[in-house]
Structure formats: C-alpha cells, structure tokens
C-alpha cells in the first residue's frame, strides 16, 4: 500500500519516501501487517510510505535450477527479486504520491531486516534506495548448499507430483 503524510512541515515540496519490508522469516507476513505501520509512520513522519508484498516460502525461495535448467537459476531468489521490482516501482511512481524518488529509505523488521541486508548487497538494487534501516534480522541469511536446495526442491516436486524437467 501507499500512505502519504500530512505535508505538515514540508510545504509543497516532495516528501521523503520509505519502503517497508515485513518480517516473518521469509515464510509468512504481508505488507499491511503490524510491523509495517504505514499509516502511522506516514502521518507522524510526514513521509510517503510504501509497503509491499512479495513471494514467500517455497514460492519465493525454492531453487529449481537443477530440476528445470538454466532458465530457473534465479528461482531461489524470486521473493527478493520481487522486492527489487517493488523498488523500481517506487522509483518510477512515488512522485505521483508526493514522494521524492531521490530520497528513499528502506526498512524492515526481523525477517524484513534480513531482506534489507540482502538488498544492500545486491547489484540489481543499487540506486533504487538511498538509506536503509535493517531492524534486527540476520546480516547474512543462513547458507543453504546447492545440494540441500536441490534435495528440498526434489521433495517439494515429489509431493506435488511434478517430475524434473516437465
């Protein structure tokens, strides 16, 4: 969602933008959840707050590259790539809501904080935000080996009755 503040102390100028990323360990949560507080933050800070949803759990993190080939090599990162796409949207659209595309801060709590750390390290996210507030969360997500990721994908595909390569 997009929430705009009151323009209280800023006159008619563009307001800073904030992009909120919810917590939930990458497994659950949503952009309008209690850890986002977009409306309260927008009015208290006179900023434009954008909260987003993104793919979670196996929809956002299941690696299918070994099962389906090169076309799926980024499949384990689709949830984070959704966040990059949302930042591109903010860059292209926040001005229509009174926000400044050159002054965007991203923030996240817990699992959302971990995603903020990830965005700080991603070349594809460079230039899409200007400051970051990772509130708790892992600096580095626990690593999963290619072998473990492939085993998890194989188990999920078997449960769904899907064969490799189909």
Model-derived segments and spans:
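Serine-hydrolase-like catalytic core of hydrolytic proteins
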Residues: 1-164
